[in-house]
Amino acid sequence: MYRGIHLLRTAAALAALAFTSTSILADPPAGKPPEHPEHPDKPKQPEFAKDLPTQAQLLDALKKVVDVGGDDNGGFGLNMWATMVNRDGIVTAVAFSGNDRGDQWPGSRVISAQKANTANSFSLPKLALSTANLYSAVQPGGTLFGLQHSNPVDTENAYKGPSSNYGQNNDPLVGHKVGGVNVFGGGLALYNKDGKLVGGLGVSGDTSCTDHNVAWKLRHALNLDNVPGGVNPVSKDDNIVYDITLDVQGHPVSASGWGHPDCGLGEKAIAVKLPTDFPIGPTP
């Protein structure tokens, strides 16, 4: 009789263990719902990136905007890097337009991240500043001289590997603050359709003037250009300003204080038309 009771208890214990094991395998941890049960192959956008496009969306838009070997954006017609950061300066996505990470200047990966961080860091809910707008103010004697040294790049996050992941969905920069301040064209603040400032975009890989043109078109393609206003004296937005002339002593002077040099490869004519050809404001 004792043996029979012992066998029954053992069987019951094994059954309970089997049920528990099955439940653990079948159910997600408490408080954590399964990711995209209707699309199990689609990764969930992390919380820090919820207000911004996915890496795939950034990549697709970048490839459409970059005109390799052409003159749609001025400059040399090179491949480009693009990086987005959220409002806290955390990198949410990195992409490149070429077929491999070596098809565009390797150094421009971190520069694009710097630009994204700068545009986000020095823009406000009611005032957008592009990195191009900062050029004149940071020159010796300018009102923001030294700004470019104020927030250094976090080199540990910027350069950790493996390099094969650079520009991919799992780029080592993603999820980290890169820091850095860049003061030439290519960085723009991102405003959603409701006018909320949600982060910054940085583009690098050609002349700084072309970088700005590509960034403007890319921001427009992502529908994140509902800009509230800026310092451009003509268009009243964050478009690049070309008003630098030489004074009697041969020193460059910006009439507005927000000027950027003309790179001289057709970029200026394109930039002047950006507010008309790619107007700011939400796309329905």
Q: What kind of region is each of these model predictions?
A:
Residues 2-11:
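Bacterial N-terminal signal peptides that target proteins for export
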Residues 14-17:
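Short, linear, compositionally biased motifs with a strong N-terminal bias
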Residues 20-21:
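N-terminal signal peptide c-region/cleavage motif recognized by signal peptidases
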Residues 24-26:
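Boundary at the C-terminal end of the N-terminal hydrophobic targeting segment
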Residues 28-284:
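Flexible, solvent-exposed loop/hinge segments and secondary-structure transition points
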